[in-house]
Structures are given as structure tokens and as C-alpha cells.
Amino acid sequence: TTLYKLYQNAFTPWEWQPELKHIAEEEGLICFSSPFDKTSVDFLEAMDVPAYKIASFEITDIPLIEYVASKMKPVIISTGIATYEDIEGAIAACKRVGNDQIALLKCTSSYPAPVALANLRTIPDMRERFKLPVGLSDHTMSSSVAIASVALGARILEKHFILDRGDRKSVV
């Protein structure tokens, strides 16, 4: 599978974004998104999103991270299978452009992720190592992992879920 095919299956159509943001705001929620290129950053800037999330498979795209960080909004970086060096590089990219509004998400890159692979002890380790707020990108089919992550210091929760088990494209 190429990254192009992955993006084709994973992206939220641009024409949905303004309505999703409007509905989120009506519900008192903060709506932001993961851009995959500079064009999508510009699109999201035009919508005045308050923050950005860097998807785990973009953590080594330093030019993209610098461009996102240059908007001087909070940047939430999902770590997936990244090495500590990859994470340090992404953090440095944000700081290089003067943005220190950074948080990290501990992420198990498996869909769905087995609870046994959650490795939540990584959360306090990342918080200590990087001196940043750390959260969880939870791909498990359970709510227990997210709850346990808060006990271990998670400050942000991203929960993936499936709207329709018969439709693999309904993962949110």
C-alpha cells in the first residue's frame, strides 16, 4: 500500500470540514484536524482551526511539521512507531520556528489495537523524557485503556471508534 492509497482511505473530504467544525462548535467542542501537506494546512488555516494534530506516519515529515508549527497554534504529535529520535526531531522542528505549544500522543499503531499492546507505562516515561504534556491515541475496542491512561497522567484522549462494523471506512 502506498501513502497515496492510505490517504485516499483515511482523509475526511474537504467539503465536510466546515460543517463538522460548525457542528462541533455548536456542541461546545474544539474541532481541529491532521493535515498531510501544506495545501491542507492552508485550507485549515482559512477555517481558523485552533490547533493541529500531526498523524503518527507524518512525524518524520519535518518540513510539514515546521509549516504547521509556524502557524503558532498548539501542535499535538501522535507518536505511533516513532523512535525517540523521531519524536525529538518533531519537537525540535516546532521549537525551531518558535512554537513551544506542543503535546505528544502515545499511540499503538494497530487497528484495532489489542489491549495487551497498549503499553501505557510509556505515558509517564514520555512526559518525563520530553517534559511535555502527553496523551493517548486509543485504537482499542475498550474504554478501559483510555481510563487507565488518565491514571498514568494522560492529559489528552483521542479515541478511535467504528460507526458501522460492516463498513471499514467508518472508523472515526
Located regions from the model:
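Catalytic cores and adjacent flexible loops of soluble metabolic enzymes
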Residues: T1-V172
